[in-house]
Curated annotation (Swiss-Prot):
Note: Heme 1 (or BL or b562) is low-potential and absorbs at about 562 nm, and heme 2 (or BH or b566) is high-potential and absorbs at about 566 nm.
Residues at which a ubiquinone binds: 201
Chain segments annotated as transmembrane: 33-53, 77-98, 113-133, 178-198, 226-246, 288-308, 320-340, 347-367
UniProt lineage: Eukaryota, Metazoa, Chordata, Craniata, Vertebrata
Annotated residues for binding of heme b b562: 83, 182
Name by which UniProt lists this protein: Cytochrome b
Cofactor dependency: heme b
Length: 380
């Protein structure tokens, strides 16, 4: 008699995904971040559900309801800060996951990669609408500035902005619909995650060597379940330290002030995980140009499979592209720093240089490095 998990209609799906899944024997800890993202999503949905039980999406009471959650609800402060800092951990894992995909050439599994880009965009949208909900100063002005960017779209821009706002400014209607979006989007993300997993299990994972690993596979359980468990413990430890010791370190001080349409904060900036894109947006003096650069800064990820002309899979044995990759990461950190700085010299100039380098590395330098490395291989 075969084991139940292998022939039960429901259990065999779980079995083929998490138990008997053939996995390359040499995947490193950089492959842990997929499961960590799954844990982050579960934490966000659970804490978000409990927050939604006490939150009111009305301009008159939203700010007070968040204060009420922190002061009067049992462990409300913990749930609120787990949710806020959980988003930061989510994005840290997301950036590392995408970075690993770029480094090890996972983008050649194009369906998985493209679903991943859609997931990235959906997560960014979820985080943006969620940032507006506490209805602090930066929530309000962040929503105003970012949604107002859509007015740069020719002909339909202004109508589109008013349609999203539900009026002539960010107000009660905007907050209500943003709450609705923030509630539904994580479930859409969860559905997309299943599609993402479906495609990755069609082809199997890539591995650090970039070679075909069909001849050297091991079952996912117990080897990688234990390995993932260690990653999860480390993630939870870091999140706990963040929540209990530095809960507001990644937030904005302006969000302790209730939203006031008559008073603009000195420097409007989004949450830290959007700063790199915000810096690219600000580095172009033209509104429409800035919006296009902002969109392109994420969609450029879709160009990786098209621009890749290397004979090797991944960067493990490609020192020139490796160097470019780490310059790209350093440049991304510089953009993140610039996004949080005021719009003045020398920050504007640094931002413009970093923005140009961001696109130049991906579109021009990496393909050139690929060709040079191909020629070096031919010589030997």
């Amino acid at each position: 008699m075969t084991i139940m998990r292998k022939n039960h209609p429901l259990l065999k799906i779980i079995n083929h995904s998490f138990i008997d899944l053939p996995t390359p024997s040499n995947i490193s800890s950089w492959w842990n971040f997929g499961s960590l993202l799954g844990i982050c999503l579960m934490i966000q949905i659970l804490t978000g559900l409990f927050l939604a039980m006490h939150y009111t999406s009305d301009t008159a009471t939203a700010f007070s309801s968040v204060a009420h959650i922190c002061r009067d609800v049992n462990y409300g402060w913990l749930i609120r800060y787990l949710h806020a800092n959980g988003a930061s951990m989510f994005f840290i894992c997301l950036f590392i996951h995408v970075g690993r995909g770029i480094y090890y050439g996972s983008y050649m599994l194009s369906e998985t990669w493209n679903i991943g880009i859609i997931l990235f965009l959906t997560t960014m949208a979820t985080a943006f609408v969620g940032y507006v909900l506490p209805w602090g100063q930066m929530s309000f002005w962040g929503a105003t500035v970012i949604t107002n960017l859509l007015s740069a779209i020719p002909y339909i821009g202004n109508t589109l902005v008013e349609w999203i706002w539900g009026g002539f400014s960010v107000d009660k209607a905007t907050l209500t619909r943003f709450f609705a979006f923030h509630f539904i989007l994580p479930f859409i993300i969860a559905a997309l995650v299943l599609v993402h997993l479906l495609f990755i299990h069609e082809t199997g994972s890539x591995n650090p060597s970039g070679l075909n690993s069909d001849s050297d596979k091991i079952p996912f359980h117990p080897y990688y379940t234990i390995k993932d468990l260690l990653g999860i413990l480390l993630l939870l430890m870091x999140l706990t330290i963040l929540v209990l010791f530095f809960p507001d370190i990644l937030g904005d001080p302006d969000n302790f002030t209730p939203a006031n349409p008559l008073n603009t904060p000195a420097h409007i900036k989004p949450x830290w995980y959007f700063l790199f894109a915000y810096a690219i947006l600000r580095s172009i003096p033209n509104k429409l140009g800035g919006v296009l650069a902002l969109i392109l800064s994420i969609l450029i990820l879709a160009a990786f499979p098209l621009l890749n002309c290397s004979k090797q899979h991944g960067l493990a044995y490609r020192p020139i592209t490796q160097t470019l990759f780490w310059i790209f990461i350093a440049n991304l950190l510089i953009l993140t720093w610039i996004g949080g700085q005021p719009v003045e010299y020398p920050f504007t100039t640094i931002g413009q240089m970093a923005s140009i380098l961001y696109f130049t590395i991906i579109i021009i330098l990496m393909p050139i490095a690929n060709m040079i490395e191909n020629n070096i291989l031919k010589m030997h």
